[in-house]
Every structure is written in C-alpha cells, then in structure tokens.
C-alpha cells in the first residue's frame, strides 16, 4: 500500500515537472520584421527574456494579450516560421556586472564582440550565439574587506572585497547586490578567483545565499541609491567653449543636437578622451560602424599620465556598439545596457560619463517598433510616449550617495548626441530632449561649413548649471565667472553690430564698437575655435582657458578705456600694440605638455606687458 502511494506521488511530481516544462514553451503565431507574436504564452510577464525559434534568438516581451504576447527580437528574424518554439526564461533582460567590464566592447545586449569573433571567426555576429558577458576563464586577485567578520550583518551595496582590474581602475569594489541582505556565514580569503566562484555566503530567514564577484541587474530598472545629492562639481571637457561658456556638472544631462557633419561625434569622443571622469561608457547607438572603429583604433594609443607613467585611456572605457547595420530592436536595448553599466560604476563611488551617440537613432528604432505594433503615431510618426521614454533615460543621471558601507558618492553624467534631419531643431526628438536636459550645446551647420570647430552656436546654446558652479569656480579660479560674463557680453554685442555693418559699413561704428568688434574676432577665431587634431589644442586645461580669457579681457578693458577718454583712436592703439595683438592670437599654441608652471609664467608675462604698454600709451 505504502509503495503504491509513493509511486503515485512520484507520478504526480513528474507530471508537474512535465507541465512546467511545457508551460515554458509557446509557439510563433506571426512574424513582422523584428516583431514576433507568440501563442500559448500564459504566465509570461512584461519585459521577460525569451528565446525565439530553433536558433534561440534573443527577444523581449513588450505586450501581452490573453495567451498571446508580442516580442521584439534583438537579432535578424529571417527564416523564422509559424509554429517554431518560443522558450521563456522567467527573467528580464539583464546585464552581468563585475570585474572585466572595462576595456571591453559589447553589442546592444551585452554580448562581448571579441569573444564572439574568436568563437565564430566571422566579422558578423552569428544568429543565436550565446556567450558569457564576463570572462569566466580569467582569474582576478580578490582582497576581502578587512572589517568584515563572520556573524556580521550585511545589506545591499555593502562592499565585501575589492579587485585590481587595471592601472586606471585599480579598486574595483565587489558589492552585495542592492536587494540582498543577511548574516555572514562565510567569506573567502585573499587569492585569485574566477568571477563566478563563491566569495561570500549569507544567511537570511534560515536560507543561505552565495555571492560571487558578479551579479546581474535588469537593464530597465534604475539601480537604487541611498540619497540623491545636488551636483556641484564641473565636468571639465578640455574644450574651451564648453568649459568657459556652457559648463556641465558631474551628474548632469547634456544634449548635442546638430546636422550631419557638424562634429557631434568628435565632441563626444573628445569628452571620452579628455574629460575629468573616472570611467567612460560610450554607446554607439545606430551610428556608422566606422565611428566605433575609429574609437577602437584611437583610444588604445591615447594616454594619460598616472604617477608619471602613460596609460591608454581604453583602460577606463567600456564600449557598447550597436551600429546602423545591426538589428533595429537592439538599439533600444543598447541605451539601457549602457546606462546600467554606468550606474554600476557610480555605485563604486566613481564619476562616470555616458555618451549616447545618437539618441535620434534610438528614437527611430522606437518609431519602427511602434509602427509594427500598430500604435497610434504622434508627431512625425514617433510614438506618443517618446518624451516619457527619453525622460526616464535622462533621469538616471545625477550625483548620489551610494547604498551600503563604506560611505561613497558617485555621479553619472549623460551626454546625448541628437541628429535632427536637416539640422532642424524643431524635430520631435530634439524638442523632447530640450525639455529634459539642463545643458544645450547647439551645433551650427554654417560654422561647420566655415571649418569653425567645435561648431557651437553661442546664441543658441545655454547651461542651467552656471549658478550651481559659481562657488566652485570662485574658490579655485577667482574671477572666472566675471570673465565669462564679459566674454558673453562681447559676443552678443558683436552679433548686434554685424547687422549695422551690413547696412552702413564698418566706418560708421564708434571707436569703442571697433574695439569690441576686433576683440570679438580674437575670441571667436582664437579662443572658441579649437583644433582637435593638434597636440597643443586638442585638450585645453582649465588654467590655460582662464589665463587666455584674462589676457583678452585685460587688453579689451584697457583699449576700451583708452578710446573712451578720447586721447588715442583705436587704429593707433592697434598699430602700436600689434605685437601684443599677435601674441593674443597665438596664446592657444602653448602646449600643456610643457607643464602648468611654464605656461602660466608665459601668460603672466603677457598680462604685465599689456598693462605696461597701455600705461605708456595713455601717459
């Protein structure tokens, strides 16, 4: 009798297992480009990861209706047929977070491109390929947290050890996942471990949980923080026009809209190369593959000095490449993949910059998928929720106090390039972006055609962070804010004068206006313009920017006051100070590699020369 009951229980268990196995599979009902409808999918959840077809293509559930669900597939769907199996995974689209992220190039759903190439020996990504995001073969030197003991209580975000990843990222903190907690029952000793080996075991409610160096996190969910803080440190870019006139903060949001050929990618790349961020996440979203190839070729050659030793900046960079010839649906995921990686770095207590090039291509991917779903189109065919999607992405930027102990602060700055068709800033993507971001670096097609780079339009661009940054500038660079206001004023005055000159000619201007016009010419041609491909000017440190501004404004102030007294006309001043005028135009040629002290001395000498010359002129 007892044996019969046991057999019955065993049969019920096997039937349950069979049902569960059967419930994990649906079948394809229809295929429309990257959008697949699957039937018999009862129990699946929104944004669940699924495997589509016999090749197990990666897809994500984006709509559920009765037992049917709509899936966006992140790979080429040609060859799928009605009736092919659809396997549920029971988890959302997630990324792996841990040592090995830096120096790696991923596709839009965090598949490492180098490993895929080594595995397939093809320049194209094979369909359905499944590789681990983090290298399971490599061993990392783990150092446990010396303050952690068995029996201690830990919660999400607590650092239980660290790993030396590379010379630019030498303190990769190993943290408890944000939602984990418990009492420590085991912690590994110092040594070399693979990313998936058990390093920590905690007990909570009688259940034991093991943790390794890596953990996963769903890309569409923002990582939690202990507190959001006000950003008050500048994101220094090395571009004079941006640092001086339209600064951004670490933890800020910036848009760079501009037509084709205006230099959006060059600005994004120079930010990645020279900004004062600790780590960079560069997302190439729907742009040309050559641009990502350029990044891969340039970055290993570019170096920054760490303790007197040059290190390639690739060591602080993670690339997410989703070029225009890759499947459209993966563009949408690539932005979320990039921001999740950036948030993980922020939780390390780092200042992170994320470049999204370009959010317009991401919006176009949304439009295509929205059209396939037969949703009601809004302006220019974009979905009605475009603004909400953009806002939810940009809102993940900011400065925050991280979860767990020890206390640490980190920032995520987002710089989004926008490519409006024909450079039209009334485009829905540009309009929606401008309502969200705090800094607007507008690029001008006419300036780009005149080979004036960076082609920032000074009358269109703005920054809402200037007031927040004033205390920082006053403390470290006294007088910087006043110089900025004076330079902006000169540029605005010149813009209004140009209309008068076109009507009545330059001779009709007053003497003070002639001074303003000539100094504005120096500011525009020799200060705002910058050669990104030269040693001396590709990156301009803040001290160089400040002294250039100081000397130009000193000359302007002295010349203007001399002209206003009526003692000397501007033409005579310009003639007698022609050597100083030439030196003002040549200030940009000072190479920062020569050292700060030497350059500052040169600028100070020029400043004294200006004062002495005008003193003798006005006597």
Swiss-Prot record:
Family annotation (SUPFAM superfamilies): C-terminal domain of alpha and beta subunits of F1 ATP synthase, N-terminal domain of alpha and beta subunits of F1 ATP synthase, P-loop containing nucleoside triphosphate hydrolases
Coiled coil: none
GO biological process: ATP metabolic process; intracellular arginine homeostasis; intracellular histidine homeostasis; intracellular lysine homeostasis; proton transmembrane transport
Top class in the EC scheme: translocase
GO cellular component, one term: fungal-type vacuole membrane
Membrane topology: Peripheral membrane protein
Gene Ontology molecular function terms on file: ATP binding; ATP hydrolysis activity; proton-transporting ATPase activity, rotational mechanism
One family name in Pfam for this protein: ATP-synt_VA_C
Catalytic activity field: ATP + H2O + 4 H(+)(in) = ADP + phosphate + 5 H(+)(out)
Signal peptide: none
Binding-site positions, ATP: 258-265
InterPro entries recorded: ATP-synt_VA_C, ATP-synth_a_Xtn, ATP_synth_asu-like_sf, ATPase_a/bsu_AS, ATPase_F1/V1/A1_a/bsu_N, ATPase_F1/V1/A1_a/bsu_N_sf, ATPase_F1/V1/A1_a/bsu_nucl-bd, ATPase_F1/V1_b/a_C
EC number, as in UniProt: 7.1.2.2
Cellular compartments annotated: Vacuole membrane
Family: Belongs to the ATPase alpha/beta chains family.
SUBUNIT field: V-ATPase is a heteromultimeric enzyme composed of a peripheral catalytic V1 complex (components A to H) attached to an integral membrane V0 proton pore complex (components: a, c, c', c'', d, e, f and VOA1).
Name of this protein: V-type proton ATPase catalytic subunit A
């Amino acid at each position: 009798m007892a044996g019969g009951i046991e057999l019955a229980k065993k049969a019920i268990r096997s039937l349950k297992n069979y049902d569960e196995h059967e419930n994990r599979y649906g079948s394809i009902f229809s295929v429309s480009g990257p959008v697949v409808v699957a039937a018999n999918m009862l129990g699946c959840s929104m944004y669940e990861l699924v495997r589509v077809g016999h090749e197990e293509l990666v897809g994500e559930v984006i709509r559920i209706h009765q037992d049917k669900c709509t899936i966006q597939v992140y790979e080429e769907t040609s060859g799928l047929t009605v009736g092919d199996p659809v396997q549920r995974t029971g988890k959302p689209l997630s990324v792996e977070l841990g040592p090995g992220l830096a120096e790696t190039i991923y596709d839009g759903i965090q598949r490492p491109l180098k490993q895929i190439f080594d595995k397939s020996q093809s320049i194209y990504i094979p369909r359905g390929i499944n590789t681990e995001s983090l290298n399971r073969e490599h061993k990392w030197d783990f150092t446990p947290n010396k303050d952690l003991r068995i029996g201690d209580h830990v919660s999400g975000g607590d650092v239980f050890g660290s790993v030396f990843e590379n010379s630019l990222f030498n303190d990769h903190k190993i943290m408890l996942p944000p939602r984990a907690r418990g009492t420590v029952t085991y912690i590994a000793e110092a040594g070399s471990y693979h990313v998936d080996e058990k390093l920590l075991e905690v007990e909570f409610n009688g259940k034991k949980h093991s943790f390794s160096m890596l953990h996963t996190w769903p890309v569409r969910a923002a990582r939690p923080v202990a507190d959001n803080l006000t950003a008050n440190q500048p994101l220094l870019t090395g571009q004079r026009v941006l640092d001086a006139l339209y600064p951004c903060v670490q933890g800020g949001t910036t848009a760079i809209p501009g037509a084709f050929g205006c230099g959006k990618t060059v600005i994004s790349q120079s930010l990645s190369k020279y900004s004062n961020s600790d780590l960079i996440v560069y997302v190439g979203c729907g742009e040309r593959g050559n641009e990502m190839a350029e990044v891969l070729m340039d970055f290993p050659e570019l170096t920054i000095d760490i303790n007197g030793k040059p290190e390639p900046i690739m060591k602080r960079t993670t690339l997410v490449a989703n070029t225009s010839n890759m499947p459209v649906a993966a563009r949408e995921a690539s932005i979320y993949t990039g921001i999740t990686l950036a948030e993980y770095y922020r939780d390390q207590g780092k200042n992170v910059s994320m470049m999204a090039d370009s959010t317009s291509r991401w919006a176009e991917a949304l439009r295509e998928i929205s059209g396939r779903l037969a949703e009601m189109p809004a302006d220019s065919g974009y979905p009605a929720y475009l603004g909400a999607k953009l806002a939810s992405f940009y809102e993940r930027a900011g400065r925050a106090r991280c979860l767990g102990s020890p206390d640490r602060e980190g920032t995520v700055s987002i710089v989004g390039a926008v490519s409006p068709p024909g450079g039209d800033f009334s485009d829905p993507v540009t309009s929606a972006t401008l309502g969200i971001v705090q800094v607007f670096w507008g690029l001008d097609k006419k300036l780009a055609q005149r080979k004036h780079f960076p082609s920032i339009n000074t009358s269109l661009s703005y920054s809402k962070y200037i007031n927040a940054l004033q205390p920082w500038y006053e403390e470290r660079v006294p007088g910087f804010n006043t110089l900025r206001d004076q330079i902006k004023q000169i540029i605005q005055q010149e813009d209004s004068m140009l209309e008068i000159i076109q009507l009545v000619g330059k001779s009709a201007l007053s003497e003070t206006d002639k001074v303003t016009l000539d100094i504005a010419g120096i500011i525009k041609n020799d200060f705002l313009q910058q050669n990104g491909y030269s040693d001396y000017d590709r990156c301009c440190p803040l001290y160089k920017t400040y002294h250039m501004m100081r000397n130009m404004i000193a000359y302007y102030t002295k010349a203007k006051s001399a002209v206003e007294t009526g003692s000397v006309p501007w033409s005579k001043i310009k003639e007698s100070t022609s050597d100083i005028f030439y030196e003002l135009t040549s200030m940009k040629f000072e190479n920062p590699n020569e050292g700060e002290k030497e350059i500052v001395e040169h600028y100070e000498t020029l400043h004294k020369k200006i004062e002495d010359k005008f003193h003798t002129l006005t006597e």
